[in-house]
Amino acid sequence: NRSKAVASLRKTFADHDFLEVETPMLQTVHGGAAARPFTTHMNAFDLDLYLRIAPELFLKRCLVGGIDRVFEINRDFRNEGVDATHAPEFTMVEAYQAYGNYDTIGALVKQLVQDTAMDVFGSHKVTLLDGTEYDFGGEWKTISMYDSLSEALGEEIVPNGGPDNPGTSVEHLGEIADKLGVERDDVENHGKLVEHLWEHFYEDKLYEPTFVRDFPVETSPLVKGHRTKPGVVEKWDLYVRGFEL
């Protein structure tokens, strides 16, 4: 099934004119994610190197170099904890498209998942390891992080749009977090508190395929700003059965 899934991913990418590349595994600077890297040493050049934690930076160089649609299916390494959902060595699928937006990429991801399910199982309904069935078919739900958090709290949470439109204050968000018993980081800002509060209400409760979109700018500073909403970026995460894919 794994080989069928990988073949299906490659076919769907090819159908959308994406070019597959292989980027370096050994890197002088680890980046593209917040994770602890494995380190090694290249004797030939007396050089300390890192096993990559993500291919993002090199894939984005491909975009800058003129490859408008690019993807990679390959191994990444993160020297962190191990559990049922995390491994120190794992296969990642990562893709980038120029002249698109988060709507076009969202539609692509939906097709990638549905095509893979069809090619492996012959249906959008897949059989999981515990024997239960899960349906990837039909329309997928989309929710806004700020709108859904406001609904859960019973009050409007406003994005931080800058000095002229500061939105809901860090102090007020902190008070809400303390009241709910939500853990807080040592370094706090509006965006981090919004995400922590949202995760408290929703993260493990989104069973059906759901795109969560419009994140705070503070937690995703390199993402394109929202076209109409100050303080928000055009980013989504996909949740399935309570897990972020």
How would you describe each model-predicted region?
Residues P24-A117, Y134-D135, E139-L245:
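A translation/RNA-centric and nucleic-acid-associated enzymatic feature enriched
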Residues L128-E133:
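Short linear capping/connector segments at secondary-structure termini
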Residues N1-H16, V21-H30:
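Extended, charge-rich, solvent-exposed interface segments
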Residues T116-V126:
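Flexible helix-coil linker/hinge segments at domain or subdomain boundaries
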